[in-house]
Swiss-Prot record:
Active site, per annotation: 91, 332
Annotated family: Belongs to the radical SAM superfamily. RlmN family.
Enzyme class: transferase
Record protein name field: Probable dual-specificity RNA methyltransferase RlmN
Catalytic reactions of this protein: adenosine(2503) in 23S rRNA + 2 reduced [2Fe-2S]-[ferredoxin] + 2 S-adenosyl-L-methionine = 2-methyladenosine(2503) in 23S rRNA + 5'-deoxyadenosine + L-methionine + 2 oxidized [2Fe-2S]-[ferredoxin] + S-adenosyl-L-homocysteine; adenosine(37) in tRNA + 2 reduced [2Fe-2S]-[ferredoxin] + 2 S-adenosyl-L-methionine = 2-methyladenosine(37) in tRNA + 5'-deoxyadenosine + L-methionine + 2 oxidized [2Fe-2S]-[ferredoxin] + S-adenosyl-L-homocysteine
Residues where [4Fe-4S] cluster binds: 111, 115, 118
Gene3D superfamilies per record: 1.10.150.530, Aldolase class I (3.20.20.70)
Cofactor binding annotation: Binds 1 [4Fe-4S] cluster. The cluster is coordinated with 3 cysteines and an exchangeable S-adenosyl-L-methionine.
Protein encoded by which gene: rlmN
Known role: Specifically methylates position 2 of adenine 2503 in 23S rRNA and position 2 of adenine 37 in tRNAs.
Keywords: 4Fe-4S, Cytoplasm, Disulfide bond, Iron, Iron-sulfur, Metal-binding, Methyltransferase, rRNA processing, S-adenosyl-L-methionine, Transferase, tRNA processing
NCBIfam families from the UniProt entry: rRNA_mod_RlmN
Species this chain originates from: Clostridium novyi (strain NT)
Length: 343
């Protein structure tokens, strides 16, 4: 038995053809799943009984269960703990804006990257999610909020480029007009900086936004915060970023979590200006989320503002990330860890 959500439309057409079914049935099934949110073959009224039986013998539609749901009293952000059939739990977050609903999805159960400011990596990685398991987060969230999701952010638990093949398939699926039809420019992928995979992603020539978890203006600080920096230098990472925007003509976003006394000085800001000058980029400053397992403290609000103003004065487009759902353990991985610890 296979999870039908792991199939592209072309793959499902091929399966239909090889199993003596008309190829157009594949498109009908896609419409039921992705357009009408019907996750039971028996409820697909324009599919013949014999075809339904064949589908049930060969496929299932894996939609995770909601084990916990939290709704922010501040901004209406909805955070879900989803449980897959093997008992593993991940989290997804739906953020509501005037321009539409955005979902932050997880790409792995846990993470092996070891970034010191991130809760999802504390217990390591359990396994990769399949493309179907990632897209199921979007399908289930839409069903829960009774509204369409128009933007997708790959910033939940896991390193997307450490699960490259499944993530690429997921991106193509959600962009497919016969599936969720979410425009590539409404998709953001965040990575800690796996240099060869950034270049591979560039060669896909997608129009998604690439967000780099930079968090430091030099190799010394970055190595202290992110183990990946011991494998790829800042210079190698920036070279990959230049390749990405030359290939795709898409602006890079640099994410920079400000940690008190670590990377938030004026000198650090000036170093950041130096390495980002001349690049088609935007810097997103993030007040770091404090995690019990590390000793990082959030920079003071006035220091964050001063850091931002220093960058802006030198022509660097800079914003401070708006905190969504801060009253319900919004930091990546916090909800999952707390739930597992208490159950």
């Amino acid at each position: 038995m296979k999870n039908i959500l792991n199939f592209t439309l072309d793959e499902l057409k091929d399966w239909m053809d090889k199993n003596s079914e008309s190829k157009f049935r594949a498109k009908q099934i896609f419409q039921w799943i992705y357009k009408k949110a019907v996750f039971n073959f028996d409820d697909m009224s324009n599919i013949s009984k014999s075809t339904k039986e064949k589908l049930k013998e060969n496929f299932y539609i894996q939609i995770p269960n909601v084990v916990k749901k939290y709704v922010s009293n501040i901004d209406g952000t909805e955070k879900f703990l989803f449980e897959y059939e093997d008992g593993n739990i991940i989290e997804s977050v739906v953020m509501k804006y005037k321009h539409g609903n955005s979902i932050c999805v997880s790409t792995q159960i846990g993470c092996r990257m070891g970034c010191k400011f991130c809760a999802s990596t504390v217990d390591g990685v359990v396994r990769n999610l399949t493309s179907g398991e990632i897209i199921a987060q979007v399908l289930k969230a839409q069903k829960e909020i009774c509204d369409r999701i128009s933007n997708v952010v790959l910033m939940g638990s896991g390193e997307p480029l450490d699960n490259y093949d499944n993530v690429i398939k997921f991106l193509k699926l959600i962009n497919d007009e016969d599936a969720l039809n979410i425009g590539q420019r409404h998709i953001t992928l965040s990575t800690c900086g796996i240099v060869p995979k950034i270049k591979e992603l560039a060669d896909q020539k997608m129009q998604i936004t690439l967000a780099i978890s930079l968090h430091a203006p030099n190799n010394e600080i970055r190595k202290s915060m992110m183990p990946i920096a011991n494998k790829y230098t800042l210079e190698e990472l920036l070279d990959a970023c230049r390749y990405y925007y030359r290939t795709t003509n898409r602006r890079i976003t640099f994410e920079y979590a400000l940690v008190k006394g670590v990377n938030d000085s004026r000198e650090n800001a000036e170093e950041l200006i130096k390495i980002s000058k001349g690049m088609l980029c935007h810097i997103n400053l993030i007040p770091v989320n404090e995690i019990k397992e590390n000793n990082y403290e959030r920079s003071k609000s006035k220091d964050i503002e001063e850091f931002k103003e220093t960058l802006i004065k030198h022509g660097i487009e800079t914003t401070i990330r708006r905190e969504m759902g801060s009253d319900i353990n919004g930091a990546c991985g916090q909800l999952r860890r707390n739930y597992i610890r208490n159950n």
